[in-house]
Amino acid sequence: MVGPALLILISYHLYHKLSTSPQLSFDLNTIQQNISKNGMLLPLVSLLLMLLQWTIEALKWRKILGAVSFHMKWATSLKMIFAGQSFSFITPNRMGEFIGRVVYLPSEKKGIGTAFTVYNTVVQISVYCFFASIAFYFYDATSLSKKLSSSTGEWIEILQLVALLISFACIIFFVIQKRLFIFLMNAHFLKKFTNIWSACMQINHETSIVMLGLTILKTLVIVFQYWVVFSWLGVDISFISTFAGVSLMLFGLVVIPTISFVEIGLRWEFSYLLFSVYTSNLLGITIGATIIWLLNVVLPAIIGAFWLIFKPIDRIDP
């Protein structure tokens, strides 16, 4: 009940801010004119960018499973990714994603699939934190402090430090990962997970670098997708400013526990807050964030649910 209640509260708060904005009529007119002028090409591009980012995610999943000689078609990997999205839609911080990813693996390999999902999450968090660390240098924290309170700058410095520390911790993890898995494999109280640690040891540095590279590419695709949607709605904002705002928003979504179906509330609040230093068209920013959520979160979850119910794929054998 907490999640829906929070969503209602945030929605009311945002509605109040937008409805009382003196620029509401002007922003709405700007959006309507730009949609009419730009047509449907840019929304189509943003849809293709959604498919591209999940294609990249499917390549990552195929790559990491290949480390333990699990070979599959790209299309099968993509279906597993979408299935994971359908489960993650109703779980905190998308923790249910592993269920969809491993549901088609043999029973004795589900533990390995779960461990690989966690590893993939670590890769994603490390990239989001790295991007946030860069974004903090581009972000206009002074303007945000003037809009909120004088202590905002101090909080931004703390969050920047947190992003740097998490990034540094992830780098250390990737450097020592093999020794860490050997330690876990030899730990007496973790003996029953020996096969999982042994599988994780097969993730070499080449695989890690490829996964990091693909995750960086996927994140840049997301940033570009936001910029395309904002341009379609007539929001006058540069790509660098979009990069800063989106990177910080993704970082916020990582560190704050939430559920996908109420995540839209946080996206609204983050977008309204972070982009307010770059543009006055906050209605366009809010609509853009909603469109991206529908494309990147809701639509993949629906596709995944469809495949799970109507088009089940065969179990994958090594």
Task: Go through the PLM ranges and name each one.
Residues I81, Q85, I112-I125, E154-V162, ...:
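Alpha-helical membrane-spanning segments of integral membrane proteins, especially the hydrophobic core
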Residues F87-T91, A115-Y137, T290-I302:
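Membrane-embedded alpha-helical segments of transport systems
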Residues L78-Y104:
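Extended non-transmembrane interhelical loops and adjacent amphipathic helices
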Residues W74-S77, R94, E108-V122, N281-I291:
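Membrane-interface alpha-helices at helix entry/exit sites of multi-pass transporters
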Residues F87-F89, S247-W268:
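Transmembrane alpha-helix interface/packing and boundary motifs in multi-pass membrane proteins
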Residues G66, R101, S231, S276-V277:
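Transmembrane helix-loop junction
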Residues M1-M80, F138-I256, L295-P318:
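Predominantly cytoplasmic-facing regulatory/coupling regions of multi-pass membrane proteins
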Residues V103-K109, W268-G284:
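Interfacial segments of multi-pass membrane proteins
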